[in-house]
Amino acid sequence: MDSSPLVRPVETTDSASWLSMRCELWPDGTCQEHQSEIAEFLSGKVARPAAVLIAVAPDGEALGFAELSIRPYAEECYSGNVAFLEGWYVVPSARRQGVGVALVKAAEHWARGRGCTEFASDTQLTNSASTSAHLAAGFTEVAQVRCFRKPL
């Protein structure tokens, strides 16, 4: 990747790319289920995720996404208004190039704008790549259930 990605709110025109990446991130769900959830989000019918950000290359290629919510609690977070990274994905060809960090920074900006002072996430215990990505983005591991907290 030659330059920084543009990170912006997901749009209807991003549906196919978002669907493809969601199917990769969460293969236990069917692509039809993901497609239905995307349609519900874009129509404003769901509360979670509260926001979806997409990273795109200068040529418009989708590089990753972040799905965000605000929760009343997350592991080791006590503010009562915690931004939560519900889903975070970067396409394999764009990994280790700053795309994931760019998504997290944009998510932090979104969270601060909603009054959040903490940002949390989680991952499976066996997902060492995700753990490394969270740590590289500034999160601190706070529990062995692989929950993360990041002050904003």
From Swiss-Prot:
Positions contributing to acetyl-CoA binding: N127
E.C. code: 2.3.1.82
Catalysed reaction, written as an equation: kanamycin B + acetyl-CoA = N(6')-acetylkanamycin B + CoA + H(+)
Gene Ontology molecular functions: aminoglycoside 6'-N-acetyltransferase activity
GO biological process, one term: response to antibiotic
Function: Catalyzes the transfer of an acetyl group from acetyl-CoA to the 6'-amino group of aminoglycoside molecules conferring resistance to antibiotics containing the purpurosamine ring including amikacin.
Record note on quaternary structure: Homodimer.
Protein name: Aminoglycoside N(6')-acetyltransferase type 1
Organism of this sequence: Klebsiella aerogenes (Enterobacter aerogenes)
